[in-house]
UniProtKB/Swiss-Prot annotation:
Gene3D superfamilies: HUPs, Pantoate-beta-alanine ligase, C-terminal domain
Miscellaneous notes: The reaction proceeds by a bi uni uni bi ping pong mechanism.
EC number of the protein: 6.3.2.1
First-tier enzyme category under EC: ligase
Catalytic activity: (R)-pantoate + beta-alanine + ATP = (R)-pantothenate + AMP + diphosphate + H(+)
Protein name as annotated: Pantothenate synthetase
SUPFAM superfamilies cross-referenced by the UniProt entry: Nucleotidylyl transferase (SSF52374)
Pfam families recorded: Pantoate_ligase
Family statement: Belongs to the pantothenate synthetase family.
Subcellular compartments: Cytoplasm
Ligand binding (ATP): 29-36, 147-150, 184-187
Swiss-Prot/TrEMBL keywords: ATP-binding, Cytoplasm, Ligase, Nucleotide-binding, Pantothenate biosynthesis
Function as written in the Swiss-Prot or TrEMBL entry: Catalyzes the condensation of pantoate with beta-alanine in an ATP-dependent reaction via a pantoyl-adenylate intermediate.
Length: 261
């Protein structure tokens, strides 16, 4: 696996080694888990070359503590990527991505950007879209692989690619879950054993609910030891965000299926 630590190196690799080949791109913030691995395996099966990025983007964190405590396990991530036979790891610094600071930003005006995560985390989608645009311009992939767990993010990136005439196809892959139904997330690494027990209780509640009374469901989730931030039906999906201790988790799933594995 080739590791590119800056944009110049990646451009050199792209120009010299992967001309005329189909490129799949999996953007991550590191702390890789089986959800990321499923995206990478999908990309490997459909492309000649796979690029994975690891960049914890500071501009999409509205909570400084969340940014500071985001899991960092670069050496372990490199081992995982090497075991998957990833072709290129792009691991830029903040200075590479924001050489002059955060002077220009994408400000989404879509309704979906202002509800749920957009309402709960002001500025999050602006920072996310800005860095995704930069990463797509740098890597110039044929295919971009995203997880369904970040459903709002996926919808906004689709609009970004459309509005900026980016010649990249978006492939959305199913959410990977633990047997309890809890979606895999890098933030799960910050959960204690007690937190995990609470999460399992919450997902037992969710699996058994028909989502006809969200107020009652809210009380059940909070009584299980979580602090629900929001739960909402949107079209045929259920969206929710909650805290277990200091760890914030999000999920979405089809109302008919619930959080099934």
């Amino acid at each position: 696996m080739i590791i590119a630590d800056n944009i110049k190196q990646l451009h050199s690799i792209r120009n010299s080694l992967i001309k005329q080949q189909k490129i799949g791109f999996v953007p991550t913030m590191g702390a890789l888990h089986n959800g990321h691995i499923s995206l990478i395996k999908k990309a490997k099966s459909e492309n000649d070359v796979v690029i994975v990025s690891i960049f914890v983007n500071p501009t999409q964190f509205n909570n400084p503590n969340d940014y500071q405590t985001y899991p960092n396990q670069l050496q372990q991530d490199i081992q995982i990527l090497e075991s998957l036979d990833v072709d290129v790891l792009f691991n830029p610094s903040e200075k590479d991505i924001y050489p002059d600071g955060n002077l220009l930003r994408i400000e989404p005006k879509l309704e979906i950007a202002n509800i749920l995560e957009g309402k709960s985390r002001p500025g999050h989608f602006s920072g996310m879209l800005t860095v995704v645009l930069k990463l797509l311009q740098i890597t110039k992939p044929n295919n971009l692989y995203l997880g369904e767990k970040d459903y709002q993010q996926v919808m906004l990136i689709k609009q970004l690619v459309k509005d900026f005439f980016i010649n990249t196809k978006i492939i959305v892959c199913p959410t990977q879950r633990q047997p309890s139904g809890l979606p895999l997330s890098s933030r799960n690494k910050n959960l204690t054993s007690t937190d995990i027990e609470i999460a399992n209780k919450i997902y037992e509640i969710l699996r058994q609910d028909d989502f006809s009374n969200l107020e009652e469901l809210t009380n059940k989730i909070n009584s299980a030891g979580a602090k629900l931030q929001y739960i909402q039906k949107l079209n045929n999906r259920i969206f929710l965000a909650f805290y277990i201790g200091k760890v914030r988790l999000i999920d979405n799933f089809l109302k008919e299926t619930g959080p099934s594995c």
